[in-house]
Amino acid sequence: MGNNRWQGASWATLGDSITAAGGYQPLVQAELGFAKVDNFGRGGCPMTAGSDRDDGATVYMGRSLEQAYDCLTIFAGTNDYRLNMPLGVLRPIGSAFDNHTFFGAYQSLIEELLTRYPLCRMNLWTPLQRDKDGYDSEKRNDKGCLLADYAAAVQSIGQAYALPVLDLYAVSGFNKLTLDSFTNDRLHPNQEGYRRIAQTAASFLAAI
């Protein structure tokens, strides 16, 4: 697919350990022809501020970007669910946001980055289904939220800002029956899992 719009372009990825591991980026790069890929993922960290892993919170990592990218992917949510970070509510564009909620941190980050880099093609990915440490697609966390609630929040945010959303929660094929085939521990993808993510992501990115 060397004649697509991303040939020679730059791509930054923000997220947690699934991003930090660098498993999907080289596969997507080979497929789409990105010339530069920078990985800002931080293992174990949520989007939301206020956890004991605050220094790596995606909301802060994203703000540290010091250059414009042609494409920017935000892939977060599973640690917010696991660490019982408050979901919050979607607020109008331009509001004062609470970085200690998932919605607030996500909206705050998006607004800061879009203000700085309005031409960047930002895209949001929902968290994958999981089944680890007693946290799966059916369990409510200590805040009363399902993982699907965080995935739905990402979709709502994407719609509010007219940003494309890749709903990996719904279309990746990761579920309780397949997690042993796609992950090492029913959370973190193995080689086959990253291949599946990359295939899905490449088609998505090629279309935006």
Please provide the spans of the model-predicted regions.
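Generic structural signal for well-ordered alpha-helices
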Residues: 61, 106-110, 151
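Conserved SGNH/GDSL esterase-like catalytic core that processes O-acyl groups on lipids
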Residues: 5-104
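A short helix->loop->beta-strand "cap" motif at the edges of active sites that frequently abuts
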Residues: 34, 117-121
